[in-house]
């Protein structure tokens, strides 16, 4: 193994939960970038309360920034996983996902869960990306 396949790049979004729980917003190893479960928050406070589309937009902007900080972009995303507290929000969430990924078309899963840390969060999204060449 060489340095490019073993070097870990940790990306923080500044979430107050990162040091408490011990996680990174994203991790890059070689040409793989994994973005952890991302919710619509700013400074630890929920945004887009009651609006799953607004939350999805905020989440995907956070994910795009994390990817950028890891030397990747949305065009490198190969998989997303979307978790909803109410599956009835699938279309509103899906339409925003389509705005960001319409031409990229990663594989995607959408699941209903019982809840998140904050009851104001309606959506959480994870993303995996593959960058053609290591360039960090």
Residue ranges with predicted function:
Residues 1-61, 65-78, 84-136:
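N-terminal presequence-like segments and the immediate start of the first folded domain
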């Amino acid at each position: 193994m060489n340095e490019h396949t073993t070097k870990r790049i940790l990306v923080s979004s500044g979430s107050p939960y990162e040091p408490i729980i011990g996680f990174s917003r994203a991790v890059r190893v070689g040409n793989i970038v994994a973005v952890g479960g991302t919710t619509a928050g700013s400074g630890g406070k929920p945004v887009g309360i009651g609006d799953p589309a607004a939350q999805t937009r905020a989440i995907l902007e956070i994910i795009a920034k994390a990817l950028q900080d890891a030397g990747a972009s949305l065009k490198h995303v190969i998989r997303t996983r979307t978790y909803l507290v109410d599956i009835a929000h699938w279309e509103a969430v899906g339409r925003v996902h389509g705005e960001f990924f319409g031409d990229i078309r990663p594989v995607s899963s959408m699941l209903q869960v019982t809840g998140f840390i904050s009851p104001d969060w309606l959506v959480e999204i994870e993303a995996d990306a593959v960058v053609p060449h290591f360039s960090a």
